[in-house]
Amino acid sequence: MTTQNQTDNQTTSRRSLFQAEFNNESLSNAEIINKRRVINGYDDGLMQVSPLKHPWAREIFKNMQRNNWVAEEVPFQKDKEQWESGALTDQEKDTFLRALAFASNLDGLLVHSLSEIIKPSITSPEVSLAIARQIYEECLHVDSYSVMIEAVGLDPEDVYGLYRRDKSLYYKNKRVWESMFKIKRHNFDTQNTEDAKLFLEACTTNLIFEGIFFFSAFLVFYNFGRHKKMPGSKEMIQFINRDEDLHVQLFVNIINEIKREQPELWTQAVQDKMAQNIVDAVQMEYEWGCSCIGDGILGITPDTLKEYIQFIGDLRLTAIGLPKVFNTKNPFPWIDEFTQGNMIEVNFFEGTVREYQTGSLEW
């Protein structure tokens, strides 16, 4: 016996799109657009973007295009000279390597999460376009870290292989991997309410990765730049940070749009789970950041690092409609000189971002 869910799946599945006989009385274009959703919507697989059902996704996609850059634009000669000349202390070198190690590991994991977990469930073509562009940008970041490693003259094993020697990084990567792929199973289907809730949780997980887990590393690189150290690395991170901020905006909009389209998913239990995941991520990022800076480095202390990560955590909570937990202020106001125009700290619901010039950090 065919269930209603099976019938619905057949009408929305790309696999069954052209299996039926031609019927010129099938859904009209307007009906197709009206049936679109971020997930569980009508999906003919033809990627017809216009007219738009989700204009915020197209806007983000266009801003991603305007941000286009390549790693070879960034000069690293000064970084190489400083690394080899003793301009950095042993502690500073260790902090630099640890920050670079996790950032490079995480971008690699994100490529898999987006392509294998998130994108297959998206049924809105304009949202799918933005996710595809994000996958490209994560690949660009992976390549950029490689360029940085080679240009500065670092041993790749010291960066990519650190998790095999460092217990804290190993377990952080392990927790990231497990949280990313908890929904990856053969019979996962967002038509099922519980699976749709898991997908919403997976989107929040990606928001955490993009919007919390990079930030102690970004802080380290910007702090080096503030002290006139490793300027090329700082510039590379500015490019990457600018991309990540749009990724954060994309997932905030995805989460909020799913809430609007399928409010039955946004139960109190789901809200509590999302909030706890963000709170746990803040603690995890703080612990990792402390392992990088030790008792403190170049003005960053464990206490100020904690305040900063908590400040970021509250931004992510409020962006998806959850209350603040930490109520801390940004203890590093100087960071604005490096992130001006690309740190997203305000109302995500407005769906607006600054426009940038291609291949430039001028805004």
Enumerate the predicted regions with their spans.
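Non-heme di-metal
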Residues: T2-W363
